Amino acid sequence: MIRLLGRGGTDLPGRIALKLCPNLLGVLAKNVTTVIVTGTNGKTTTSRMIEQSWIESGISYFANKSGANLLSGVTAEFAVHSSLSGKCRYTHALIEADEAAFKAIGKFVDPNAIVVTNVFRDQLDRYGEVTHTLENIRIGIENSPHAKLALNADDSLCTSLAGAVPNPVLFYGVNTPIYASRVEELSDAPYCIRCKHAYVYDYVTYGHLGKYRCPVCGYSRPEPEIAVSEVAVTDAEHSEVVFDDGKKRIPATI
């Protein structure tokens, strides 16, 4: 039906399909190694970085590049990449998921990994306060018990998820300042998520992201397993950085 409509990757065919078969996504996603990327900002950039690594590794995959990141759109993407019998033609799926829709997607897709980029206030009109967005993501993770998490160590909201769910966690982050910034002017999360006292920052990378610590309860940025250790060039077009995983340094252009 989705192929006949010629609108794979858009919401309408997926909505129609889900009306006919509410568990369609669960059927189509079965036995597909799936990585979900969610968060307020950076989902598309992060997805394209993962995608490039899959291309270079020769992995058979599809991705929802069309931007259809709601439950209906993700269902449509799986459908157009599956046979008429419901078997996906690819071994892997890279799914960019809207934060609010993620909690529903997790009920049907059993992802192998979930990347959470950050939680910012620019979703205010749709989702209310940042704590509500954070709760949506937590529920999505709770619905994905087999997933390994990749969490942004620089985001005090994002890292709080590690203590809220039992999933194994890998932290990533930026171990060097990028821009001069005043936290009190830019921060969406100036106060400790545990005790509500103001954070102290050793440096800021962007907004409320950076090396934070609470001087009262001790809640602080975890040490990332993989991090940007050097930013050589950054402009509107690209950034030249060095990644460090504790064993080797890897130059990269983003």
Predicted regions span which residues?
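Phosphate-binding loop of NTP-binding sites
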Residues: 1-173, 181-192
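Adenine nucleotide phosphate-binding catalytic loops in nucleotide-utilizing enzymes
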Residues: 170-254
